[in-house]
Amino acid sequence: MTPTPDAPAAADADAATGAGWLARRRGALARVALAPVAQAIGRVERVADGIAFVSGLEDTMLNEVLRFEGGVTGFAHTLDEDLISVVLLDPDAGVRAQTAVARTGAVLEVPAGPQLLGRVVDPLGRPLDGGAPLDAAHTLPIERAAPAIIERDLVSEPLDTGVLIVDALFTIGRGQRELIIGDRATGKTSLAIDAIVNQRHSDVICVYVAIGQRASAVRRVIDAVRRYGAPERCVFVVAPAACAPGLQWIAPFAGFSIAEYFRDRGQHALVVVDDLTKHAATHRELALLTREPPGREAYPGDIFYVHARLLERAAKLSAALGGGSLSALPIAETDAGNLAAYIPTNLISITDGQIVLDSALFAANQRPAVDVGLSVSRVGGKAQHPALRAASGRLRLDYAQFLELEAFTRFGGLTDARLRAQITRGERIRALITQPRFRALRTLDEVVLLKALAAGALDAMSPDLVAPLRERLPAWLDARIAALTPALAPPRDWLADDAALDALAESVGELIERIAADAARRATAGMPAEDAAGDIGGAFGGEQARGDADRDADHGANREVSREVSPEASREVSREVSCEVSHEADRDAAADAARVAGRAPGRAEPDRAAPRAMPDGPPRAQADGDRASASRPRPDARGDAARTAPSPQGGADANVDAEAEARHKR
C-alpha cells in the first residue's frame, strides 16, 4: 500500500508549481513586441538638392532614419519647431511635395564583421563590387561614443608604414591619429596607401574611406591594394563624388564603426579617411541648405565638433578591454600651402601630429615630399622600436643642418672641409629618404641602412647609387641572415642584438662595392644605368625595378658564406669575395675613368681632335669608342671621374687598357 503525502506538503508543492507557471507567463508577455496601433505620418513640404523639409513629425529624434513613400530613406539632420530637415541617402527622383514620410524609430547603422573583409561597399553597407549582399545579422550605429579616459591605454606600439622617413622621424603608433596634409597632387593618398600596403605582413585590419573622390581614382587605389597589399584584410567604403551628399557625410562615421568592430575584439585596425577637406565641404553644403547660420569661411559653428567626435574614436584600449587599437590617418588638402586656414588648423589641433607634404619638394622629385621642418609626431619615440630610435637619433638634426647649409651654398662655394662633409652626408640622407611607391622597407632594413649611414659607409658612394642600395638591401640581408643562421636553429630577434645589427651594417659595405662595380660595368658596356628614383610606371608596373640579376649576384656572394656559420669564417669569405669584385671593378673603373678624363672640360681641344685626324689604328678606335660612350646615358660621369681619377702613371696604363679593349671590339 503506497503512502499518501500529508496535506501541508501537497499544498506547498501546488503553490510552487503555480508560482513557476506565473513567472513563465510573465516572461512570455515581456518578450512580446507591441507595435503602436497608430503611426504618425508626415508630409514633404519641399525638396531640393538632396534635402527634404518634412512637417508633421514633431517627435522625431536627431539622426533618426525616415522612410519616404517609394522606398527612399533619409536621416533627420536638423529639428525645427515646424519642419524637419531630412538628408536623403538615395536619389531624390521619387520624392516630391506632399510625399508621405514615416518614422522608423532606428538610427543609421552599418553592417560590421568579417564578411566585409575584401569588399567594396557604400556607407550603408550595400555592395559596390558586384558581390553578394552582406549579412546584416550584426550591425553597429554609425554614431558611437568615443572610449572614455579610463578605457584607454598609452600608445606604445609602432604602426610600421615601411616608409623610412616616416618610421624614422615621425613614428606612428597603434591608436594614434596622424594627419597627412598638403597641397593638391603632392602624394598624400600615395603615402596613406603605402601604409595600407605595408600591413600585408602584419595583423592590422585596414579600412579605406573615399569621400567625394573620382571613381577612376578610387579604382586605382583599390587595384593598387589588390596588387601589392592584402585585400583580404581590407575594407573599402566608397562615397564617390556622384553619390548623394548624405552618403558622403556619413562615410567616415561608417568607416570608423566598421573598424571599431575589430578593435573591440582585441584586434588592431587602421582607418584612412580620404579626405576630410571634402567632408568639411559637404558638411558646409548641408548646413547652408538647411539654413544653419554660417561662420568662418561659411562653415557652420559645429564643424570642429563634428571632426573632433569622429577622430576621438581612434584609441588604444586598455588590457581589460582586450588591448585592441584603432589608428587613424586622416587626409586634408591645403590651398597654396596655407596651413593657417580654418579646416587645417582644426584638424592639426585635433590630431596627434601631422605629416606635411610640400609641393616644391614634390616638384624636385623627392618622394615622399615630406617637409621635415613642419611635420611632427606627438607620440614619436614612445612608440618607436628601440633599435630604430637609437639608429635615427641624429638623422633629423643632420638633415636640417644640411638643408640650411644647402641654402647658403647657392650664394657661393664652401671651403671648410667640415661643412663639405655635412653637405655630402645630407645629400646621401636625401637620396636615402627618397623612396618610390610600393617599395616598403622592413624595420630591420631601416635600422641597418641608418646604422650604415651613421658609420659613414654611404659617404663615399654617389647619391645616384643610394637607390639601388635601398632596393637590393632586403634580399642581401635575407641571404646574409640565412647564411649566418645554423640549420634547425630557433628564430633569432636580430633587432634585439646590437652586435648582430652592427655586423649586418658592416656587411653593407660589401654590397656597396658590388653596386659600384655593377654601375661601372654597365657604364663600360653601354647599358643604361639603374633608375635612381625607382618609381617606374608610377603606381603600377614598378615591381620589376629591382633587378633579378642583381638579386642573383647577391645571393651568389652570400652563398659562399653559408659554408661556415661562424662570424670569423663569414668575414673571411666576405673579404675574399669582395677582393675579387674589387679587382674586377678597379679594372673596369680605370677604363671608364680614362674615357671620362678624355672628355673633361680641362682637356685641351687639340688633344680630343688629334686622334680623329689619324687615318686608322688604335687612336681612331679609341675616339670612336669615346663618341659611342658619350652618346650613352651615364649615371654620374663627373662623380665617377672624381672617384676613380688615376695618377699620371695609372692614367697611361688605363689608356693602354682602354685602347686594347677598343681594338678588341673592332
Curated annotation (Swiss-Prot):
Bilayer topology: Peripheral membrane protein
Gene Ontology molecular function: any one: ATP binding
Catalysed conversion reaction: ATP + H2O + 4 H(+)(in) = ADP + phosphate + 5 H(+)(out)
Organism: Burkholderia pseudomallei (strain 1106a)
Function according to Swiss-Prot or TrEMBL: Produces ATP from ADP in the presence of a proton gradient across the membrane. The alpha chain is a regulatory subunit.
Keyword Nucleotide-binding: yes
Name of the protein in question: ATP synthase subunit alpha 2
Composition skew (Basic and acidic residues), residue ranges: 545-590, 623-641
Known partners and oligomeric status: F-type ATPases have 2 components, CF(1) - the catalytic core - and CF(0) - the membrane proton channel. CF(1) has five subunits: alpha(3), beta(3), gamma(1), delta(1), epsilon(1). CF(0) has three main subunits: a(1), b(2) and c(9-12). The alpha and beta chains form an alternating ring which encloses part of the gamma chain. CF(1) is attached to CF(0) by a central stalk formed by the gamma and epsilon chains, while a peripheral stalk is formed by the delta and b chains.
Gene behind this protein: atpA2
Ranges annotated as biased composition (Low complexity): 591-601
Family designation: Belongs to the ATPase alpha/beta chains family.
A GO CC term assigned to this protein in UniProt: plasma membrane
Subcellular location: Cell inner membrane
EC id: 7.1.2.2
Region annotated Disordered, chain positions: 527-666
Ranges in a coiled coil: none
